């Protein structure tokens, strides 16, 4: 996956979370369609500048691989939490400004001023593809550990 392929996905209507989740078909046992649908509402921090959609998709992938689904399964829950915290640590090393779109972009898409800045500087195509690539890289590392 490259920044260019991510940008091309964006141009075709596939958003950040969908791009990230879609890279993990084999690891999750889910189809590309299912992964994209699962992450379809995350774009631009749920269009509020909140938690980055790529990060939310990473959490979904971690949950699909390591999540617990039975009451009292503290061991599995513990493993999932360790993976999530490791992802947070590694992503935070790359993006110390935070996990929210408005922090990562330096502008809040949910405000007219922020939306204007994002559009004028083309941040969704200049910055977000790199973030998506970094999320995938970090997540692959976390899964392999």
Describe these PLM feature segments.
Residues 26-37, 64-86:
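Phosphate-handling active-site elements
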Residues 1-27:
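Active-site-proximal helix-loop elements at catalytic-domain edges
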Residues 3-11, 41-50, 120-124:
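A short glycine/serine-rich beta->alpha loop
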Residues 35, 47-54:
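Active-site nucleophile and cofactor-binding loops and adjacent substrate-binding regions
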Residues 81-145:
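C-terminal binding/interaction regions
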Residues 57-65:
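DPxDG-like acidic metal-binding loop motif
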Residues 12-16, 30, 127, 131:
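Short, contiguous, pocket-lining structural segments
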Residues 20, 38-43:
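Short alpha-helical scaffolding segments that buttress acidic/His motifs in well-ordered protein cores
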């Amino acid at each position: 996956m490259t920044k260019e392929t991510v940008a091309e996905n964006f141009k075709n209507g596939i958003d950040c979370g969908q791009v990230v989740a879609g890279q993990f078909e084999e690891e999750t046992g889910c189809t590309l369609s299912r992964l994209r649908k699962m992450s379809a509402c995350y774009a631009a921090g749920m269009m509020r500048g909140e938690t980055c959609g790529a990060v939310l998709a990473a959490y979904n992938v971690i949950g699909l691989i390591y999540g617990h689904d039975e009451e009292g399964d503290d061991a599995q829950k513990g493993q999932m939490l360790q993976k999530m915290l490791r992802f947070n640590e590694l992503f935070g090393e790359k993006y110390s400004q935070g996990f929210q779109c408005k922090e990562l972009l330096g502008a809040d898409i949910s405000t007219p001023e922020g939306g204007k800045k994002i559009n004028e500087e083309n941040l969704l195509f200049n910055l977000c593809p790199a973030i998506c690539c970094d999320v995938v890289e970090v997540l692959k590392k976390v899964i392999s550990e």
